[in-house]
């Protein structure tokens, strides 16, 4: 697990560095989209993933391939960033860097993502109302990501970063049971 935490920290550092470069180029959105495309390609193309992971292929060779594939399609500094990742043997962190980049970019724009668990599918109006209430409660623009879990019985469970707001019927019934001194039936 420590390697995962260390990988996240390293990914965040690279994401911060790329965001600084992207802001200097006045294109944080565009660079984020490019990074996401590269990350998706790595995640979805087994051959590309194997190529980048292979210790038998020199970093210089990988950089040349990146340059030929992306050279005229991406900003020079973006390509240099990817080549530096390859040189530092961090190319397999690109998907994690993309996620961290998006999180940092959104946070700077006052946008947070919330995991919203509901007992049943929500309609568009209900989803909009939940997003508006969360935005009002957090003072930020909330982008909800819905998941259905019938075991919560009703209500919602919201996770924004490390904060969990449990308004589920299951929790409320559990609290009532404890207050009444009852045990679980």
Curated annotation (Swiss-Prot):
It comes from the Bacteria. Its main location: membrane. GO terms for cellular component: plasma membrane; proton-transporting ATP synthase complex. The keyword Repeat does not apply. It is found in: Cell inner membrane. InterPro entries: ATP_synth_OSCP/delta_N_sf (IPR026015), ATPase_OSCP/dsu (IPR000711). GO terms for molecular function: proton-transporting ATP synthase activity, rotational mechanism. It is a peripheral membrane protein. The keyword DNA damage does not apply. Keywords: ATP synthesis, Cell inner membrane, Cell membrane, CF(1), Hydrogen ion transport, Ion transport, Membrane, Transport. It holds the Pfam family OSCP. NCBIfam families: ATP_synt_delta, PRK05758.2-2. F(1)F(0) ATP synthase produces ATP from ADP in the presence of a proton or sodium gradient. F-type ATPases consist of two structural domains, F(1) containing the extramembraneous catalytic core and F(0) containing the membrane proton channel, linked together by a central stalk and a peripheral stalk. During catalysis, ATP synthesis in the catalytic domain of F(1) is coupled via a rotary mechanism of the central stalk subunits to proton translocation. Belongs to the ATPase delta chain family. F-type ATPases have 2 components, F(1) - the catalytic core - and F(0) - the membrane proton channel. F(1) has five subunits: alpha(3), beta(3), gamma(1), delta(1), epsilon(1). F(0) has three main subunits: a(1), b(2) and c(10-14). The alpha and beta chains form an alternating ring which encloses part of the gamma chain. F(1) is attached to F(0) by a central stalk formed by the gamma and epsilon chains, while a peripheral stalk is formed by the delta and b chains. This is ATP synthase subunit delta. The gene is atpH.
